[in-house]
UniProtKB/Swiss-Prot annotation:
Keywords for the protein's UniProt record, in alphabetical order: Cytoplasm, DNA damage, DNA excision, DNA repair, Excision nuclease, SOS response
Protein name: UvrABC system protein C
Function: The UvrABC repair system catalyzes the recognition and processing of DNA lesions. UvrC both incises the 5' and 3' sides of the lesion. The N-terminal half is responsible for the 3' incision and the C-terminal half is responsible for the 5' incision.
Subcellular location: Cytoplasm
Transmembrane segments: none
Subunit (UniProt): Interacts with UvrB in an incision complex.
Protein family (similarity comment): Belongs to the UvrC family.
Domain (UVR): residue spans on this chain: 201-236
Alphabetized InterPro entries for the sequence: GIY-YIG_endonuc (IPR000305), GIY-YIG_endonuc_sf (IPR035901), GIY-YIG_UvrC_Cho (IPR047296), HhH_motif (IPR000445), Hlx-hairpin-Hlx_DNA-bd_motif (IPR003583), RuvA_2-like (IPR010994), UVR_dom (IPR001943), UVR_dom_sf (IPR036876)
Any one GO molecular-function label of the UniProt entry: DNA binding
Length: 610
């Protein structure tokens, strides 16, 4: 039993971080404190604040502390420990994907495109947007409003005449010198920049001036073009709520909580416009109060700087934060600009945004509760069918290829909450006879399971998308494993498609019973299995298509020694693309600038035998 009195005797009255461990030496909670002794003493009073704290204290085996220079340093260190260890009793942010941005490249003819990741590419970044869909929607809108290019640089460099985008009025064709005016292209780029900065009024003023100048010069075709642009921008304005107040960049956060599930909804406001929104469902230990949830979520969300999140000028939240001043100082230091946090007395348009965030949070939570109930019903049905006391983790495998080429295997993971997408995996299958799905499945299973697995990562069920042959190969593969974990734990189940390959006609092959089961089409257990199988199928197909597309787009020139990027570009340009290169004679290849006779022979021979 943990001797709290002896431990507390040596804890100093200094700021720092503490880590609580259980008997398995696993970190179960990470916290920080302005005064470590006072904070840690509060856990061992006779009357504890909540049942959650009681459960936490009952599991403490030992505690480690790290003294820091300041509360600010403790805050940063705390979130690093939480992110690294994912402790059981901490609120955990599950979705830590980086946000997409719109990038306006630094180029003679700038390109506008979506971007996610570290901002290493030179150019101007606008955002963040809540998801890739919001970026695509904005890019589609921009292409209709402002005719600047969105094509890849490699495509742009190899054009000898305008593409379809020019013909339908969505690009000025800067790739072809005789078709565009540099001044007009620069003008359109500037309009895009102003539009993305939220300065719609300046965009319209500029276009009105251009329209009037064109009319005075009797260039009525250009005047009509500018008129249409003005109408399009105004139509976009009418669809958006734009604040009359002068607002900086804001993130508006509202928290809804019911039946042990929390929804944190964020509105991203930039230049007075709502760029988009996103709902998060953090993992919340039982009996967690909302103030702790708010503190932990905001800290984790903005301090995970490796996710390339942009910290706004102001964060507005509808729950009081216990350490808003310290958190604002840390965020200001991380962001390189002043960051304020407002958790009370919100007025004006900001209160309207907060009300909107609250409505969205409550709606998203209601939907999530319904979905969770639905998922639990399906899980209960599957547990009853298989006579299992619990199902914590399920994995499913599928194989995808085209006539035996570019074979990819997928593994998707489900837990009690549904798809666990952070644990999804794909495996490139190599060194087998093309089209041998049994060998592909064996290789995928070996890649996945022939190594050490943590206890919680061992699946209770493994679904194999295939019939008796696939299941038997999977059983043989498992029998051959030499691993430290219990390889007998997972229940292997084959999911064979019906004769007509229609949903609802699947046959389940249960390995432990050595028999087939046909479930009725309205069975909740069958619906869960279909969901898992379809998810695995889609994941495999997506990976296969990417691999196939890569093989298709890689011209075959990449593997030829002596043919670098410039020579590839010259070959494609002078011979009319890859089809032209493959159809070219030896003499035609040799005539391309930079290609010697010897290199031309190598290129010709390689392509003829590929």
């Amino acid at each position: 039993m943990f001797d709290a009195k002896a431990f507390l005797a040596d804890v100093p009255h200094l700021p720092g971080v503490y880590r609580m461990y259980d008997a398995k030496n696993t970190i179960i909670y990470v916290g920080k404190a302005k005064d470590l002794k006072k904070r840690l003493s509060s856990y061992f009073r006779s009357q504890l604040a909540s049942k959650k704290t009681e459960a936490l204290v009952a599991n403490i085996h030992h505690i480690e502390t790290t003294i820091t220079h300041s509360e600010t340093e403790a805050l940063l260190l705390e979130h690093n420990y939480i992110k690294e260890n994912q402790p059981k009793y901490n609120v955990l942010l599950r979705d830590d994907k980086s946000y997409p941005y719109i990038l306006l490249t630094k180029h003679q003819h700038p390109r506008i495109t979506s971007f996610r990741g570290s901002k290493k590419v030179a150019g101007e970044y606008f955002g963040p947007y809540p998801n890739a869909g919001a970026v695509r929607e904005t890019l589609n809108l921009l292409q209709k409003l402002f005719p600047i290019r969105q094509c890849e640089d490699s495509y742009y460099k190899n054009r000898s005449r305008p593409c379809l985008q020019y013909q339908i009025g969505r690009c000025l064709a800067p790739c072809v010198e005789s078709y565009y005016s540099q001044a007009e292209y620069d003008n359109q780029v500037n309009l895009v920049r102003l539009f993305l900065q939220g300065k719609d009024g300046q965009v319209i003023e500029h276009l009105v001036q251009k329209m009037e100048n064109a009319a005075q010069e009797l260039d009525f075709e250009a005047a009509a073009r500018f008129r249409d642009q003005i109408q399009s921008v105004r139509a976009v304005q009418e669809k958006q709520f734009v604040s009359n107040e002068r607002l900086d960049d804001l993130d508006i956060i509202s928290i809804a909580y019911q039946h042990g599930i929390a929804c944190v909804h964020i509105l991203f406001v930039r230049h007075g416009k709502v760029l988009g929104n996103r709902s998060y469902f953090p993992k919340v230990p039982n009996n967690t109060d909302l103030s702790e949830l708010a503190d932990t979520f905001v800290g984790q969300f903005y301090l995970q700087m490796n996710q390339h999140r942009t910290i706004p000028n102001q964060i507005i939240i509808d729950q009081p934060l216990s350490e808003s001043a310290a958190l604002a100082d840390v965020l200001s230091e991380q962001a390189g600009h002043k960051v304020s946090i407002a958790d009370k007395n919100i007025r004006g348009d900001k209160s309207r945004y907060l009300a909107l965030a609250k409505t969205n949070a409550e709606a998203a939570l209601t939907l999530q509760l319904k979905q969770d109930t639905h998922i639990r019903q399906r899980y209960d049905s599957l547990k009853t069918l298989l006579n299992l006391a619990e199902i914590k983790r399920m994995e499913c495998f599928d194989i995808s290829h085209t006539m035996g080429n570019q074979t990819v295997a997928s593994c998707v993971v489900f837990d009690e909450n549904g798809p666990l997408k952070s644990d999804y995996r794909r495996f490139n299958i190599e060194g087998i006879t093309g089209g041998d799905d049994y060998a592909a499945m064996e290789q995928a299973l070996l890649k996945r399971y022939s190594r050490h697995l943590e206890e919680e990562k061992i699946p209770d069920i493994i679904f194999i998308d295939g019939g008796k042959g696939q299941l038997n190969r999977a059983l043989e593969t498992f029998a051959s494993l030499n691993v430290s974990w219990d390889k007998r734990k997972p229940l292997l189940i084959g999911v064979a498609k019906g004769v007509e390959r229609k949903a609802g006609l699947e046959t389940l092959l249960i390995s432990k019973w050595d028999k087939e089961i046909h479930l009725p089409p309205d069975s909740p257990a069958l619906h869960l299995i279909q969901h898992i199988r379809d998810e695995s199928h889609n994941h495999a197909i997506t990976g296969h298509r990417k691999k196939r597309q890569k093989a298709f787009t890689e011209s075959g020139l990449e593997s030829i020694a002596g043919v670098g990027a410039k020579r590839r570009q010259a070959l494609l340009k002078y011979l009319g693309g890859m089809q032209g290169v493959k159809a070219a004679t030896l003499e035609e290849i040799q005539s391309v600038p930079g290609i010697s006779k010897q290199l031309a022979e190598v290129i010709f021979d390689t392509l003829q035998h590929s």
